[in-house]
Every structure is written in structure tokens, then in C-alpha cells.
Swiss-Prot record:
GO terms for cellular component: cytoplasm. Its main location: cytoplasm. This is Arginine--tRNA ligase. The keyword Glycoprotein does not apply. Keywords: Aminoacyl-tRNA synthetase, ATP-binding, Cytoplasm, Ligase, Nucleotide-binding, Protein biosynthesis. CDD domains: Anticodon_Ia_Arg (cd07956), ArgRS_core (cd00671). InterPro entries: aa-tRNA-synth_I_CS (IPR001412), Arg-tRNA-ligase (IPR001278), Arg-tRNA-synth_N (IPR005148), Arg-tRNA-synth_N_sf (IPR036695), ArgRS_core (IPR035684), DALR_anticod-bd (IPR008909), Rossmann-like_a/b/a_fold (IPR014729), tRNAsynth_Ia_anticodon-bd (IPR009080). It is found in: Cytoplasm. GO terms for biological process: arginyl-tRNA aminoacylation. It catalyses: tRNA(Arg) + L-arginine + ATP = L-arginyl-tRNA(Arg) + AMP + diphosphate.
Length: 597
RNA sequence: GGGGCUGUAGCUCAGCCGGAUAGAGCGACGGUUUCCUAAACCGUAGGUCGUGGGUUCGAGUCCCGCCAGCCCCGCCA
């Protein structure tokens, strides 16, 4: 309906110009043209759209809002293009103008979407690269629940942007550099030197244990700390022994990460922190040239504007430590320059999106400010932190295992699939259905992972997220199983003889449930546009849930296969477009669908 | 101390550029199956939108104060 909304907006503006020529001209001169405030109708009984602009004009025009609305409507009715599109507008309440699109126009919109891969979503015209930076686990650690949201949300946002036609660079900014490596390598040199020059000498689980030990020593032992720092400097200086050890550790971790990504069907290009190593000195030079750099306590800093620390002094972003080493702020700045920079040493991006937890908001705000002041953000480019809240257990505290450890992502996914399998088996039992082992594994795997993804995505990402297997796997409510079931129902119609591919001429609808479904289906383009702009996947989830509800109502109350000969093709067309929209929408959430479950 | 986020029904949460009587789901209670998968559908009950001011024709939404919870605050990422 975006095209129709756009057309209506223009028609409304023209009508306002004709109704109030002097005020319209004056408003345009003040570069605040009269706004019809066109919005989707807040309730179905108000039609398809509402224009609230008359209310705002009451004061400047010194007229009653309903009188203003009447004048605008009179002008609209004089416009043949408008009367061709809409029924007679209704003025309601204090002065709302309610607009209802002609049924035949809605039916024509549905027709146009049948068989359209894009489902009415326009492709972007100017396609500049978009960077989505997400997931970002640390080398030598296992992926855990802390990586869940970034990975799932980032992937979904990338999919939506790709669907709109943007060239998307999915970057995995893995933690493969810095102090942590100094600690690990120093520790391994002492306790497991094999791991540093032989591939797979220890497995990843051991490596994680070594890492934990190293971290403990680092925190407790000053001498170890110093050696570790020296090790980092060696690594950053390109010492061959350190580099080889580092390479082996990275390979090993990378393979483990890939297993998770394969399982979740997530595509990512690894470009870790180390990638930006050669560009770090230029960051310092650049900041020096921009006269932003200040030496403080031996460290190179940029002091932030508008952000005060404990003592009321401006807060610094440290870009070079007193020992000469660089840190994450330096890397992030180098990454910003690279991503906005021109090829070959740059990505030429116009939008860069970071999907990381909300706890890093201060860090990014600081880094973005420095980049801005250094002039590294091109005119019109967008640099956005997409924050999300913590994953909490049902007790409202940070999610932990019963033993109090961090939950491994692998275990979390396993449990979701296991629970889905248990549910499925007991259901099959109850219904006295018999299915192959292959069917059970496939359905349980799909439903389990879909549930994990959907539960996360369906929540506004800003707030903390309460993780609950029971809720996400529930068969009713705003859950993946409920949505998947709607798709299964349509597949059932196709199996039972409904030819969804049949092409019909004129679509015709008679039942309110059909019209409700038509109107819901036509909202898809606006929802995608909104997610692209706001980067909130939960908006897409809400839409798909509502679409499923409207479809289930239709399915329950209106016969499809047993419909009259005249109604049948149109109803099959609705089923087809619903299935396509649900599959496409779920696909943008990274969730595959099933024909039977 | 400074900064950020959050506070909406018993629970988990939506709420779009400020717009009409604040919405879902779960849970509770009641109903629906000779018919395309009842994993569904229909209905009932449930609200001082943390709180006090302000702006506005109109505030859950914007501004200011306060309260509560979570997170961050110099050489980890």
C-alpha cells in the first residue's frame, strides 16, 4: 500500500493547496508546507487511512477543524484521480478525515502481488553498500548466550536490507587481537606449548579452560600481567612465533563458530580486529592532524565534548595506551575509516550498523563522536549503534546454567530442539499419528531453532529479554510454532487439491474475513520499509503474527476448497499470497518454514 | 557523583510523525469439531500507562523534576 499512500498524500496536499491557497503558499515559504498527516487508519472501521491534518490547522486558520476537513474533502472529491482511488471520505470525531480505498483497487493490488517475488516491496534505486557488524565472538572462547541476540538480530537486519536490494557486508568483527591474546599465549607457553605450534593439539574446550586460567592469573599476578602485555606488543609487532600461535588458535575457534552459523543458517564474513592492525597508526596521525589528540598520564586521548567523568572533567577516549599499545577504541576508529573509505582500502559504505549490547552505548557514542569531529563520517552517511538488552532467565537475572556458569550457545540450541522433539512426539502419540524418524528430526530441528530466533526477534530489542523455553515453544500466542502452523495449514489446502498456482482473472471477495486478509497482506511493503529504517525486527514479527491471526480467522470461518466456483479462485489466491508473505517474512527473520508439522 | 536504558493488565510484552474508547499473548473463566491439521476459532473479566509538574486543540508518546530497577564511567572488548 506504500504506492497508494504516496499517491493519497500528494492528492491531499493538492487538495489543501486548493482549499486554503494563501495559507498553503505562506507555509511553503516558511518551508513548512501544510501536512495532511496521512497515517494508516487506527481501526478497521475507520477505513484504510486517516488524515489528521485538519486538526492542526484549526488555530492558524481560526476555523473549526470539522469545517476545515469539509473544505479539504470537497477539494478531494473534485479530483478524479482521487475518486477513482477512494470511496467518499468520511469526517469523524473532532475532524479526522477517514479514507477507504475502493475494493476493486485493493483486489487489483493483490493481483499485482501474486507471483511477484518482491511482494510489492520496491527495490532501492541507489544501492550503496551497508555494513552490518554483528555476532562478534572472541577467539579462544566458545560462543555463549551473550552472542545470541547480536547474531540473530544482526542476521535478520542484514536479510531485510538485502531484500530491499542493498549490497550488504555482513562483518564478523571477531575478538582476535589484544590483551586477551597476550594472556592466553603467555599461559600456553608455560603449560601447553604444543598448542602454539601444532594444529589442534588441544581441543577448544581445553582452550577455553586455559583461557579462564590465564584470565585468573592476569587478574592476580602482576608479573604475569607484565609478560602478557609484552606478548601483545610482540604480536602487534609481527613476531613470527607469536603470529603462528595466534593463527592456530584462530583457525580452531573459527571452525567451531562455523558449526553454529551453519546450524542457524547465518552467513558472515570474518574480518576480525586484527584486520585493522595496519591502519591503527594512521588513526593516531589523523587525530593528531585534526588537533584532537591530547597526552594524558602517558596515554594518547581524545577528550569528549559534553560527557563528564567522576570529577567533572571531560571523559577521554584512549586511543593509545601508555605502553604504546592500541586498544579497542583505536580499532573501532580504524574500522569506521575503512568502512566509509573508498576502495581498494575501504568498503565505500554509506550506512554502518553495529549490533551490540546496550552496555556498549557509551563506548560507541564516544567513538562516533571522535569520528565525527575528525571528519571521518562522510556527508549523508549513517553510523548507527543498534543496541539490545540482556538475556535474562525467568528469575529476571542474567541467564546462567543451574551450576551458575555461562550458557553455551550450542547447549541452548540443543535444548530447544530436544524440547521441540519431546513436544512433537507426545503430540503424535496423542493424535495417533505415525511419522518417520527423519520427519521428526527435521520438524523438531526447524521448530526448535525457529522458536529461539523468533522469541528473540519478536521483542523490542532495546529491553532486556526474558528467556523461556516454555514460552517460545508454546503452540499458541506470538510464537514461531503458531506462525509455522499457519503456513502448514495453507500447504494442507494445496495438498488436498487446491491449486495455489492457478491464475485467475478478476479477483472477487465478498466476506469480511477476506477483506481483512486482503488489507493485512497489503501492509507488507510498509512494514519492510519501517524495519529498514528503524532496524526493529519485532515490527516484522508483530506483522507476521497479526497476518497469521487474520488468516486463521479466515481459514476457520470461510471455506476454501468447498467454496463456490466463483469464490474458489480468489480464495486460493489469498491463500497463496498469505503463504508467500509468511514464508518471505519468516525468511527475513532467518526462519525456514514447513509443509507439515 | 556523571551518563545511558527501562517502568503500560496477575505474568511476558506491543504501542509507528503526538490523534478517536490504551492493544496483544499467556494465565483465569465460559463456549465452538459430520467440513481444508482444534498446534485453531469465538466470547468474558482484568489499566491511576512509576510519580509530580509543564507544552499542546489533543500526551502512554514531547520537555523538566522526583522515585525504583538494570547497565556503563582511563589505558579489557
Amino acid at each position: 500500500m506504500l504506492r497508494i499512500a504516496h499517491r493519497l498524500d500528494l492528492q491531499l496536499r493538492a487538495a489543501m493547496d486548493r482549499a486554503f491557497p494563501e495559507q498553503a503558499a505562506a507555509a511553503r515559504q516558511a518551508s513548512q508546507p501544510l501536512d495532511p498527516q496521512l497515517a494508516p487508519a487506527s481501526k478497521p472501521e475507520f477505513g484504510d487511512f486517516q488524515a489528521n491534518g485538519a486538526l492542526a490547522l484549526a488555530k492558524p486558520l481560526k476555523q473549526a477543524p470539522r469545517q476545515i476537513a469539509t473544505a479539504i474533502v470537497a477539494q478531494l472529491q473534485a479530483d478524479p484521480a482521487f475518486t477513482d482511488l477512494c470511496l467518499e471520505p468520511q469526517i469523524a470525531g473532532p475532524g479526522f478525515i477517514n479514507l477507504t480505498v475502493r475494493p476493486e483497487r485493493l483486489a487489483a493490488e493483490v493481483s499485482a502481488r501474486l507471483g511477484d517475488q518482491r511482494l510489492g516491496v520496491p527495490a532501492v534505486e541507489q544501492a550503496a553498500p551497508v555494513v552490518v557488524d554483528f555476532s562478534s565472538p572472541n577467539i579462544a572462547k566458545e560462543m555463549h548466550v551473550g552472542h545470541l541476540r547480536s547474531t540473530i538480530i544482526g542476521d535478520s537486519l542484514a536479510r531485510v536490507l538485502e531484500f530491499r536490494g542493498h549490497p550488504v557486508l555482513r562483518l564478523n568483527h571477531v575478538g582476535d587481537w589484544g590483551t586477551q591474546f597476550g594472556m592466553l599465549i603467555t599461559h600456553l607457553k608455560q603449560v601447553a606449548p604444543d598448542a602454539l605450534d601444532t594444529a589442534d593439539a588441544v581441543d577448544l574446550g581445553d582452550l577455553v579452560a586455559f583461557y579462564r586460567e590465564a584470565k585468573k592469573r592476569f587478574d592476580d599476578d602482576e608479573a604475569f600481567q607484565t609478560t602478557s602485555r609484552e606478548e601483545v606488543v610482540k604480536l602487534q609487532g609481527g613476531d613470527p612465533v607469536s603470529l603462528k600461535a595466534w593463527g592456530l588458535l584462530c583457525d580452531q575457534s573459527r571452525r567451531e563458530f562455523q558449526k553454529i552459523y551453519d546450524r542457524l543458517d547465518i552467513r558472515l564474513n570474518e574480518r576480525g580486529e586484527s584486520f585493522y592492525n595496519p591502519f591503527l597508526p594512521a588513526v593516531i596521525d589523523g587525530l593528531k592532524d585534526a588537533e584532537l589528540l591530547v597526552t594524558d598520564d602517558g596515554a594518547q586521548c581524545v577528550f569528549l565534548e559534553g560527557v563528564q567523568g567522576k570529577d567533572g572533567k571531560p571523559l577521554p577516549v584512549i586511543v593509545q595506551k601508555s605502553d604504546g599499545g592500541f586498544n579497542y577504541a583505536t580499532t573501532d576508529l580504524a574500522a569506521i575509516r575503512y568502512r566509509f573509505g573508498a576502495a581498494p582500502d575501504g568498503d565505500d559504505a554509506r550506512r554502518v550498523i553495529y549490533v551490540t549490547d546496550a552496555g556498549q552505548a557509551n563506548h560507541f557514542a564516544g567513538v562516533f563522536q571522535v569520528a565525527q569531529r575528525a571528519g571521518w563520517i562522510p556527508e549523508g552517511a549513517r553510523l548507527e549503534h543498534v543496541p539490545f538488552g540482556l538475556v535474562q532467565g525467568e528469575d529476571g537475572k542474567k541467564l546462567k546454567t543451574r551450576a551458575g556458569d555461562t550458557v553455551r550457545l550450542r547447549d541452548l540450541l540443543d535444548e530447544a530442539v530436544e524440547r521441540a522433539e519431546t513436544d512433537l512426539r507426545s503430540r503424535l502419540n496423542e493424535e495417533e499419528r505415525s511419522e518417520s524418524e527423519e520427519f521428526i528430526q527435521h520438524v523438531a530441528g526447524t521448530v526448535g531453532l525457529a522458536a529461539v530466533k523468533y522469541a528473540d526477534l519478536s521483542q523490542n530489542r532495546i529491553t532486556n529479554y526474558q528467556f523461556s523455553f516454555d514460552r517460545m515453544l508454546a503452540l499458541q500466542g506470538n510464537t514461531a510454532p503458531y506462525l509455522l502452523y499457519a503456513v502448514v495449514r495453507i500447504a494442507g489446502i494445496a495438498r488436498k487439491g487446491g491449486d495455489l498456482e492457478v491464475l485467475t482473472g478478476q479477483l472477487q471477495f465478498s466476506e469480511p474475513q477476506e477483506w481483512a486478509l486482503v488489507r493485512e497482506l497489503l501492509k507488507f511493503d510498509a512494514v519492510i520499509a519501517e524495519v529498514e529504517e528503524e532496524l526493529l525486527p519485532n515490527r516484522l514479527c508483530s506483522y507476521l503474527f497479526e497476518l497469521s491471526q487474520v488468516f486463521n480467522r479466515f481459514y476457520d470461518q470461510v471455506p476454501v476448497l468447498k467454496a463456490d466456483a466463483e469464490a474458489l479462485p480468489s480464495r486460493l489466491a489469498l491463500c497463496r499470497l498469505t503463504a508467500d508473505t509468511l514464508k518471505s517474512g519468516l525468511g527475513l527473520l532467518g526462519i525456514p518454514t514447513l509443509d507439515r508439522m
